């Protein structure tokens, strides 16, 4: 049972402020993807070097997720979360005014700290803001910020970059960060911390029954998804054979469906968490194998990809909810482990997917991706049954 929310009204305004923070963080994370060419030209570096701005953020986020709970164990979580939003603003300003590559990387490193830290503490913070039965709904609200940012960051960054320049785009991102900071300042309550948490707590949490298997299953799902997502464009080009407009429409459909999926996830998890955890990767696995087997019909492919997007939208909400119910006493440490597992899965899924793509093309990637997702569903069904049942 969550100790604060049982005695006080749900702090939905604070949850909304965290959603704004998520939107700002994820938007800033992916802006360089659509601005690589002008950034590289302006800083007199290659596009490959500019791309390291994304890599640096992900790497620092992974390390931060493992260390931040112990490093800030004596600090009120209100101030820690405000610090992350402050780092978001500073990061975007450093990038906007960066005269060279080191300055750019410094800004992106600060963003990685904010990103990894925020995700580590998000589930534990939600537990303090709303009653236990409202946690899935609150998490779905927060993850909707991810979906919106994913939809708008790249196209809007590219669009405004052409009109006002890439530096001004990052200045706008800094304004969004400042807005999130101000709303959080007005709405986040004081939240005491667990001063007993140490770095070794990570290992203690990992040794609890079924936690390790849960992290493995989550990593498999994210690896399978990002192997698919990384190579979706080559699939649409070579198998579905759509033009640029068709591709944009399909990807927009994926993003919109993903946004709806975050709210669907909250609805389903409030009714049956374990069933949701099993059905979603199983559905994604079937869709991956279906695209590999019968892909090539634009309308059918678009429908399956949209359904994949909606299904995946429930996944982050599901695993964050699982975390709050399985390790409620050390939700921050468990959150750090989950973030690290997901970041590693994203990197490994894309990397292994590249090897498979070179050998068997996009169809090969989708076949392996679908198989991994089905294995993850089986692992949850047979390996995590007792713990999840107890948690629900």
Protein language model features and the residues they cover:
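Helix-loop-helix hairpin linking two adjacent transmembrane segments in secondary transporters
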Residues: 101-103, 132-134, 140-186, 235
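C-terminal transmembrane helical hairpin of 12-TM major facilitator-type secondary transporters
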Residues: 275-319
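A late C-terminal transmembrane helix in Major Facilitator Superfamily
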Residues: 326-362, 369
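Cytoplasmic helix-loop-helix junction between adjacent transmembrane helices
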Residues: 107-145
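Helix-to-loop junctions at the C-terminal end of transmembrane segments
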Residues: 64-77, 261-273, 357
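Conserved MFS/SLC helix-loop-helix module at the cytosolic interface between two early adjacent transmembrane helices
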Residues: 63-99
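Helix-breaking motifs and short loop linkers at transmembrane-helix boundaries and internal kinks
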Residues: 44, 76, 97-103, 294-296
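Paired small-residue
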Residues: 91, 102-110, 299-307
């Amino acid at each position: 049972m969550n100790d604060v929310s049982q005695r006080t009204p749900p702090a939905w305004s604070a949850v909304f402020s965290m959603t704004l923070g998520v939107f700002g963080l994820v938007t800033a994370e992916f802006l360089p993807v659509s601005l690589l060419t002008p950034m590289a030209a302006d800083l007199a570096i290659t596009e490959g070097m500019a791309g390291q701005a994304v890599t640096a953020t992900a790497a620092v986020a992974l390390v931060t997720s493992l260390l931040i709970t112990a490093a800030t164990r004596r600090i009120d979580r209100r101030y820690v979360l405000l610090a992350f939003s402050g780092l978001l603003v500073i990061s975007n300003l450093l990038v906007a005014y960066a005269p060279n590559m080191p300055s750019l990387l410094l800004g992106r490193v600060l963003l990685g700290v904010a990103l990894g830290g925020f995700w580590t503490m998000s589930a534990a913070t939600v537990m303090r803001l709303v009653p236990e039965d409202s946690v899935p709904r609150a998490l779905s609200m927060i993850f909707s910020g991810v979906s919106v940012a994913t939809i708008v960051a790249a196209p809007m960054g590219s669009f405004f970059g052409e009109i006002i320049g890439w530096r001004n785009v990052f200045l706008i991102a800094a304004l969004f960060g400042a807005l999130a900071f101000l709303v959080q300042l007005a709405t986040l309550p004081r939240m005491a911390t667990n001063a007993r948490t140490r770095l070794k707590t990570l290992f203690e949490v990992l040794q609890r029954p079924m936690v390790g298997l849960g992290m493995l299953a989550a990593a498999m799902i994210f690896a399978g998804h990002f192997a698919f997502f990384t190579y979706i464009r080559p699939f649409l080009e070579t198998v579905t054979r759509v033009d640029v407009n068709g591709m944009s429409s399909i990807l927009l459909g994926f993003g919109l469906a993903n946004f709806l999926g975050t709210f669907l996830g909250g609805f389903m998890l409030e009714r049956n968490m374990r069933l949701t955890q099993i059905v979603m990767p199983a559905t994604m696995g079937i869709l991956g194998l279906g695209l590999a087997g019968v892909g090539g019909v634009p309308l059918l492919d678009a429908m399956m990809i949209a359904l994949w997007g909606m299904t995946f939208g429930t996944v982050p909400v599901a695993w964050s909810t699982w975390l709050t119910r399985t390790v409620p006493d050390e939700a921050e440490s468990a959150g750090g482990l989950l973030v690290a597992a997901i970041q590693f899965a994203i990197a490994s899924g894309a990397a292994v997917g590249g090897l498979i793509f070179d050998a068997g093309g996009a169809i090969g990637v989708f076949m392996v991706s679908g198989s991994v997702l089905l294995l993850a569903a089986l692992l949850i069904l047979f390996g995590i049954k007792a713990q999840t049942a107890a948690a629900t």
